Design a protein with these regions (language model features):
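Glycine-rich, N-terminal phosphate-binding loop of Rossmann-like dinucleotide-binding domains
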Residues: 22-23, 88-90, 240, 275, ...
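Conserved G/P- and acidic residue-centered "switch" motifs that form tight phosphate/ATP-binding loops
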Residues: 123, 230, 274
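Switch I (G2) and immediately adjacent beta-strands of P-loop GTPase domains
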Residues: 52-65, 69-73, 253-281, 299-302
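C-terminal-of-GTPase-core extension/linker across diverse P-loop GTPases
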Residues: 2-12, 54, 142-264, 281-283, ...
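Conserved beta-strand segments of alpha/beta enzyme cores
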Residues: 108, 269-271, 359
Length: 460
């Protein structure tokens, strides 16, 4: 029988309310040793799901706090076990004292993620839903929170279960036909098998196709800000993050290394990378910075090419444009339009042979509203929303497992089309089942499950 665990479930900072959680078979006994309801009842007799006011005391009878307690019955709690919460005043000192009293009463310190791990082990959620819990906690945008909340509610589990159940039914019937050829067993028709594999392939391909957007949603779009020295790149970074993150001077070449910072811009989480100005240089240190700039562009989801608009003609190096054009999205942003308002309506001539930018916009980093057009353009590059009734894959583990399942289903489909023997189709279909089982936790290895829950905070 699992032991009873305890942890502080709220942030370690002063607040109006702080929560200590308990879970395990001896939860009511531990709670009764700590908490006395105001009406004199034993805490072991509290009705489930109802807040009760009372006093929290340590083993010596000293009052630690006046708090609210609530208990949850096994099978009807987050973990699936007997559980309880003490809602105390949010002093970190008070919460630590209450936690120590819980330990003295027989509970032990919960490991990171152990409450959610118990929920998984007790069948309250699968691995995709458990991972969505930490995604919800870590969400940095409203859209990321909505996607995670939908997955906690089963938005990813449901389509995976449908594919798993369809393939399991298919393989079990295949086994019956292969193992008992003389028995009176209804044969699988080619059309039925074809339909199951086709529908499974379509569902998995659609899910895998969401990973590029999901990765950006969760981790942020790698956004390289590039251009010639002194074009206004660092000023743009500072304006987007809201404080002076990068040094800005009138001297070209001030930024000699990449400077990174996260910011939510137009509802999109960006991992902004201010780069050294790209130019030919004899300075060894600056040359290293330029090389890092090129690498940042090559791995970026979005490239913002900043061109100095304070004077004409516009000067943009063709190799910078060519480099930016390889990115999934890129914007040619004309800076300093407060100094030269004509740039907002000017017709700019790019160097001969230069790629046409996906978006062209002017901006300035000093005037109110000077970034509005650029912010709107960034939002256009990463439209919000998820597929109707669906969700986005957001982590590499899930995407890799879906990819393996998809490849196995395709291989089974190809074997069927080629007229190969049923055992070949079976082998590939079972490979898909293995990948899906690992994804949802049906057949996941213990060490992999442990790594997943180690990412959680203590108390969740």
């Amino acid at each position: 029988m699992p032991d009873t665990i305890a942890a502080i479930a709220t942030a370690s900072a002063a607040a109006a309310v702080g929560i200590v959680r308990l879970s395990g078979a001896e939860t009511r006994c531990v709670l009764a040793a700590l908490f006395t309801p105001v009406d004199g009842r034993s805490a072991a007799e509290l009705p489930p799901r109802r807040m009760t006011y009372g006093t929290v005391r340590d083993a010596e009878g000293r009052t630690l706090d006046h708090a609210l307690a609530v208990v949850f019955s096994a099978g009807h709690s987050y973990t699936g076990e007997e559980s309880a919460e003490l809602h105390c005043h949010g002093s970190p000192v008070v919460l630590q004292e209450v936690l120590r009293a819980a330990f003295a009463a027989g509970a032990r310190q919960a490991r990171a993620g152990e409450f959610t791990e118990r929920a998984f082990l007790n069948g309250k959620m699968d691995l995709t839903e458990a991972e969505a819990v930490i995604d919800l906690i870590d969400a940095e945008t409203a859209e990321a929170a909505r996607n995670a909340a939908a997955q906690v509610d089963g938005a990813l589990r449901r389509p995976l279960e449908q594919v798993y159940d369809a393939l399991l039914s298919l393989t079990s019937r295949f086994y019956a036909v292969v193992d008992y050829p003389d028995e009176d067993i209804e044969d699988l028709t080619l059309a039925e098998t074809e339909r199951t594999l086709t529908e499974s392939e379509q569902t998995l391909a659609a899910l895998l196709g969401t990973f590029a957007r999901g990765r950006v949603l969760k981790s942020g779009a790698a956004t390289a800000i590039v251009g010639a020295p002194n074009a206004g790149k660092s000023s743009l970074l500072n304006a987007l993050v809201g404080y002076d993150r990068a040094i800005v001077t009138d001297l070209p070449g001030t930024t000699r290394d990449t400077v990174e910072e996260k910011a939510v811009v137009g509802g999109v989480l960006l991992r902004l990378i201010d780069t050294a100005g790209i130019r030919e240089t004899d300075d060894a240190v600056e040359r290293l910075g330029v090389e890092r700039s090129r690498r940042a562009v090559e791995s970026a989801d979005l490239v913002i090419v900043v061109a100095d608009g304070s004077h004409t003609p516009l000067t943009v190096e063709p190799d910078i444009l060519a480099l930016a054009a390889r990115a999934p999205h890129w914007i040619l942003a004309i800076s300093k339009d407060d100094r030269n308002p004509a740039v907002k309506t000017a017709v700019w001539r790019l160097p001969d042979g230069a790629p046409v930018p996906e978006h062209l916009v002017s901006f300035n980093s000093v005037m109110p509203g000077g970034l509005d057009a650029l912010i709107d353009t960034i939002g256009d590059c990463f439209p919000a929303g998820v597929p109707a009734g669906g969700t986005l894959l957001t982590n590499a583990r899930q995407a890799e497992a879906v990819d393996r399942a998809l490849n196995a289903v395709r291989a089974a489909h190809e074997a069927l089309t080629a007229g190969l023997t049923p055992d070949v189709v079976l082998t590939e279909a079972e490979g898909a089942l293995d990948a899906l089982g690992e994804l949802t936790g049906r057949t996941a290895r213990e060490d992999m499950v442990t790594r997943i829950f180690e990412r959680f905070c203590v108390g969740k």
